[in-house]
């Protein structure tokens, strides 16, 4: 989704 690092953390 939006945001680079934030998206990976949710994955």
Swiss-Prot record:
Gene Ontology cellular component? extracellular region
Give the highest taxon in the source lineage: Eukaryota
* Predominant location: secreted
Q: Which keywords accompany this UniProt record? A: Amidation, Neuropeptide, Secreted
Its subcellular locations are: Secreted
Query: Which residues, renumbered to this chain, carry the PTM Leucine amide?
Result: 11
> What GO biological process terms are annotated to this protein in UniProt?
neuropeptide signaling pathway
Task: Give a short account of what the protein does.
Answer: FMRFamides and FMRFamide-like peptides are neuropeptides.
Protein family (similarity comment): Belongs to the FARP (FMRF amide related peptide) family.
What protein name is recorded for this chain?
A: Extended FMRFamide-9
Question: Which species?
Answer: Namaquaphasma ookiepense
Traced from the root, the source organism's taxonomic lineage reads: Eukaryota, Metazoa, Ecdysozoa, Arthropoda, Hexapoda
């Amino acid at each position: 989704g939006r945001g680079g690092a934030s998206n990976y953390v949710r994955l």
